[in-house]
Structure formats: structure tokens, C-alpha cells
């Protein structure tokens, strides 16, 4: 059987709304690709975004950015799916389930028809549900279908902790796991700053009410998307940087550990559901889970998060 030929420098973005367009803009500056294709139900929108972003190429590196169609996914290394109804003020990510599952039912089979053999990155919300939907509809191996998950939530947490402690957020190691949404869990038990446990670091920096402070930070992180949506109607810059980072890890085969959404089997007594847990990510997608230390309470909350997602999946007909 002839081996499928993949263009390792080609990416396809499906969905050219705020998130898709901002992500392409970030990817254009990354140097990862020489070809980026934009696909949208509104062809004019895709063409306009491609034209606008292309005008920045002289300040980046040579590449082609253009509007295309589903035939362009055939040889792509990675397909990013941001298409879907956006979250409106007052809505939760899970409120988007039925609308966006219907959209995925029209998108994923079109990708499957082209015998796509690269990595599929799901960004649309609710990302955990849609990642599992994409796995079922695409026929791709589970390790090659990844959701952006809590990569952005974890970045928000690290940013807030860095700000609180007056340290570089890149030195903060902390994960949010579970659902990318209201049942997300902060893994405080494993949080540290360059190897120093978070509680110790808080006291070293003069913060002695660290339980109250961290609870306040966790709430701020969980509610940040709602706050941004209320103020400017959509979030897109943070997730665009998250998409860029995930693509870097995949395209460079970095084997970095990221809290992406993927199918979980047997970790913390969770099985058969897609949610975010730290995993080693490389050129072939998910390599293995990293079962970080959790307290009993954190493990229980994670199981509750998984159970809530499972119940929603059981209501979806595919």
C-alpha cells in the first residue's frame, strides 16, 4: 500500500472567526509553516483574512497564506478546527454543545473523505466534548486528535501566580486539569515555582494567607473568559498563543508536557472520556499521560468533572 504523503510544512485552519484568524496570525509569525490554508463557510471571509494576514509576510518569513477548500486538508500536517458558534455573554461553554456538534457533523466527515493522516487540533468549544466527537467521526487514532483543553487556563493560572508572587510566569509550574470550563480543577498539590512548593514560595514572597489568595486566583482564572466576553464580546489572543504553542510542540516533536484535551484511559480511575490532563506531546500527537500528584480532594473533583462530561457525551447522537 502506498504511504500517504504529508506536507510537513502545511497547516489548515477551519473557521475564520476571531479565534481562527488570530491563530493564523500567530502561526504566520512562528516560522513553523510555509503554507497555511484558511477554510470557512463564508469564502469571502476566508479570502479577506488570508489577504490581510498575508500582507504581514514581508515582516516574517516566506510562505503562502490563502483561502481554500476541504481538498486542501489531504496532505496537511495539521488541521486546526476553530469553527463553531461563539460563547455569548451569560452562556457557558457547555451551552454550545448542540450547536457545535451539528457543525462538527458537517466538518469532520469532509476531512475523513480526504484520508487526512496528520494531527487534528480541536479548538472550538466545548473543546472536551468536541474532541471526543472528532475522534468518533474522523476515524483517526485517538492519539492524533487533540483538543486545546486547559492549555490556556493553565497559562492564565501561571500568569496570575507570577503576578501575585512577582516572579517570571515561565518559572511557575502549575496545571489546571479536567474540563475546559466550570468544573475545571486546579492541581495545587503539584504546583511549584522552579521546584519550590507553591505554599513555601508564597511565604518567601511575603504572602502568608496563601490559601485565601490561591482560592481567589483560581476563581479569577475560571471567570476570566466570562469577564473578557462581557467586556469585549470574545476571547482570542490568549487562545491564539495557545494554538501556536501546541503546534510548535507537535511540529518540532518537542515531547513537551501540555494539559491538552485527549482520551483518558485508566488515569485516576477515569476511562473513556476526553478531558485535559498533562501529557507528553510530540510529532505523533499524544505519547503518554503524566499522572501528576493530586490530593484526595483534587482527584475527587477531577472524577466529578469527568463524570459530568461523560453524561453529556451519552446524550449526543453521532
State where each predicted segment sits.
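Rossmann-like NAD(P)(H) cofactor-binding subdomain of soluble oxidoreductases
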Residues: 92-158
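C-terminal substrate-binding/catalytic lobe of Rossmann-fold NAD(P)-dependent dehydrogenases
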Residues: 138-144, 154-318
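A short, basic/flexible loop-to-alpha-helix module at the beginning of a structural domain
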Residues: 1-9
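Rossmann-like NAD(P)-binding element
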Residues: 58-119
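N-terminal Rossmann-fold NAD(P) dinucleotide-binding loop
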Residues: 20-21
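Conserved S-adenosyl-L-methionine
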Residues: 29-35, 139-142
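Conserved N-terminal Rossmann-fold NAD(P) cofactor-binding segment
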Residues: 35, 39-77, 91, 310-318
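Glycine-rich Rossmann-fold phosphate-binding loop(s) that bind the pyrophosphate
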Residues: 16-17
